[in-house]
Amino acid sequence: MKKNVLISVFVIFFSFFLNAQAKKSDFHLEVSQIFGLKDGMQNEFVYQFVENENAYKKLSQLDWEMKKLFYLGGKIDFRYRNFSFNFLGAGFLPQKSGTMTDSDWFGIASGFSEKTHLSKSENELSEGFFLDTSAGYRLNFSDFLSIKANFGFEYNYYFFMASNGYAWYGNSSTPYYSENAIFHPKSGKKEISLERINYSVYFLVNSEFHITRYFEVNPFFKVAPFSFFKEIDHHILREIFWYDSGNSFFSENQFGIEIIAKPLKKISFCFEYSYTFNIRYKGEIAANAEGEEKPFVLQKGIKSAFEQKMHNFSIGAKWSIF
């Protein structure tokens, strides 16, 4: 009985303590609903080592358009005095996403530098999501200006399907646009799937300009000290799987701006725009023709690479819990 009384007293005391801290504005908890779209392109490359030139030359390039990919998500912001912790999660709606273009240079080994194969397929995002978590500290220089530094982690997952493609096929000495190239009309079939994961550890600096008590403008810049990607291409018609992965340092960057309107004490509305781009970085590539779960064989003399350029637009409503 005495133990229960002590626990009750402790709970009551702790509740009053939290409430007092909240009233002092030391603790803040905010929840946001986010709706947005991403628009851009992700590119994958294959490079082959050419002995007579003693260099890696581009053998293949696949350009996966990401046109107006809508997503829904939520965000939680927790702050204690000048420290903050944030978590964001969002999922894409399955949708058409532009064109997948596949280009090949099969004559590079013999010194023929023209593009020999070109195909275009309808691209679709079957599923995808992204997660972002960060911790930061805010420096308040005045009522007008604050600077916030965040250290975080971002994770992205995409699964694309390219289908119903048409193509022009030359050979190792014939370009795709030649009269001697062979034209293949739309196939009406699923052709290539791409499962891609990329994540990064990043550092973000955010300037907060408090124009009025009802309006903020917050430009920001983000750089990733470490980035990693891995992807599996399934060439369905040939039943070949390609696996490639790689990492890089200080190759991914982002800049953007957030605009916040606060018409009510507990409710605010946000608009954000950002542009993400990375310096192309290379990795290893492996293959098999036995199935995705079978061992992949590392391809000697061949390298892979990853690149992306992405616009992001989002709007959100934010509720201040306390």
Where are each of the predicted segments found?
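Substrate-binding/catalytic groove segments of enzymes
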Residues: 264-270, 279-283
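Outer-envelope beta-barrel architecture signal
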Residues: 23-31, 70, 81-85, 143-149, ...
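Cleavable N-terminal export/targeting peptides
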Residues: 1-28, 322
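Post-signal peptide N-terminal segment of secreted/secretory-pathway proteins
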Residues: 64, 73-86, 90-95, 99
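Residues on the lipid-exposed face of transmembrane beta-strands in outer-membrane beta-barrel proteins
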Residues: 72-78, 131-137, 151-155, 201-209, ...
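Extracellular/periplasm-exposed beta-strand and loop segments of Gram-negative cell-envelope proteins
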Residues: 40-69, 93-130, 156-200, 224-256, ...
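Transmembrane beta-barrel strands of outer-membrane/channel proteins
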Residues: 29-39, 78, 87-93, 137, ...
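Generic N-terminal amphipathic/basic segments
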Residues: 21-47, 60
